[in-house]
Each structure stands twice: as structure tokens, then as C-alpha cells.
Amino acid sequence: MSNHPYSPRDLILPDFTPNLRSVSDVHAWNGAATFLVMYGIWVLAGRSSLKLSKTDKWLMIWWAVSGLIHIIHEGYWLFSPEFYKDKSGNYFAEVWKEYCKGDSRYASRHSAVVGIEGIAVIIVGPASLFAVYAIAKGKSYSYILQLALALVQFYGSTLYFITAFLEGDNFAMDRDHYYKYFIAQGGTWLLFPALIIIRCWKKISAACEFQDQKKAKFY
């Protein structure tokens, strides 16, 4: 008999330790940390020497939050393969034990998930924080950087869903956790990158068109 609540039930997790914190406690800490980052970035954006638009400020928040999630949350998971054994109540271990109720591939160390998260931790996370700097300073490469990052996030999320569906989509303990974690939280990494891709595409296209018009007038 399985000693864990995850699906599939025949998943073997030796010495599994259930969550020591309540679900509300885990979400409260997560929410508080996210709010502090959002508030801090909003304040810093307001003090920028440039007159940043609200959209730019929200983009700074997105890249800061997602970058820190990649580096800290996903970094912990990547380098802590036996987090499910944790008996100390470690916050990050508790977060992942809870999330695995919606996608047990994080407990079983599914190769597709390890690959996706490895790229996110090592490349996308640091580059996302660099995007915050690029927006704040109005760097010319800001839109190209954001487009590249959003494409990687969108591609990684697409693989995340497709690999689950191709293998039977049977990694959630129940429908509630399936929709709350796998669909809703996972879908966030499709929705926001898609919107950023569209915006950056329009900005870059407009800039190229402007340059073409200048060249046409010059010649």
C-alpha cells in the first residue's frame, strides 16, 4: 500500500513524510513572499529615472517574481531530489509536497520535468532578473530579451502539458488539485508569456518599420 497521497498509487516514494504545515499556512507564506516582491519592485520602478508605463512596471513585477520562483523555488526542487522525506517542516519542501498533489511527476523526478526545470533554474531565472534591469534602465535590447525569455517559458510550459497528456494525464490525486495546481498554476506560464510575446513582437515590428521608413526617406 502506498504511503503517500499522490497518483499513480503505485508510485514508490521511500520514507515519504506527509506535510507538516497546513495548506493555508503554505499558501499564506507563498502569498506574503510574492506580495513583498511585487510591492518592492513597484516602489523601485516608481523611483526609476525613466518615466515607466504601468505596463512596464507590471512586466518588471512578472519577470522579478517568475525569476525568483525559477531560481529559489524550482532551484530547491532541482537540487533536493528527496524533498518528500523532509521531516523539518522546511517551507520549500512543504510547497513541493503540496504541489505534487496536482502533479506527482515532481516527486518521481520525471525526466521531462527535470529537463524543463533545469533550464528554468540555470538560464531563465537569472535572465528574468536581468530583464527587470533592462526594463528599468530602458535598454535597447529589452524587448528582444523579453521575447526570447517568453518564448522559452511558453515552449517549456507547452512541453510540460504535452508530456503529461501523452502519458495518460494521471498525475493528480483528484480533480480539485488537478485544476488548481496543474491547470491553473501551470497555465499561468502559458498565458503571461503568450501576452508578452505578442507585445514584444508588435514593439519590435514597429521599430523595424520605423527604421525602414527612415531609410526610404534618406535614399
Swiss-Prot record:
PANTHER family, alphabetized: 3-BETA-HYDROXYSTEROID-DELTA(8),DELTA(7)-ISOMERASE, STEROL ISOMERASE
Gene Ontology CC annotation, any one: endoplasmic reticulum
Protein name: Protoglabretal synthase ISM2
Origin species: Ailanthus altissima (Tree-of-heaven)
Membrane among keywords: yes
Keywords: Isomerase, Lipid biosynthesis, Lipid metabolism, Membrane, Steroid biosynthesis, Steroid metabolism, Sterol biosynthesis, Sterol metabolism, Transmembrane, Transmembrane helix
Catalytic reaction list: 7,8-epoxymelianol = protoglabretal
Enzyme class, broadest EC rank: isomerase
InterPro entries per record: EBP, EXPERA
Encoding gene, per UniProt annotation: ISM2
Listed transmembrane segments: 26-46, 59-79, 112-132, 144-164, 178-198
Signal peptide segment: none
Function statement: Isomerase involved in the biosynthesis of glabretanes triterpene natural products such as glabretal, a component with in vitro antiproliferative properties on lymphocytes. Catalyzes the conversion of 7,8-epoxymelianol to protoglabretal via skeletal rearrangements.
Species classification: Eukaryota, Viridiplantae, Streptophyta, Embryophyta, Tracheophyta
Top-level taxon in the UniProt lineage: Eukaryota
One annotated GO molecular function: steroid Delta-isomerase activity
Biological processes annotated in GO: sterol biosynthetic process
Pathway: Secondary metabolite biosynthesis; terpenoid biosynthesis
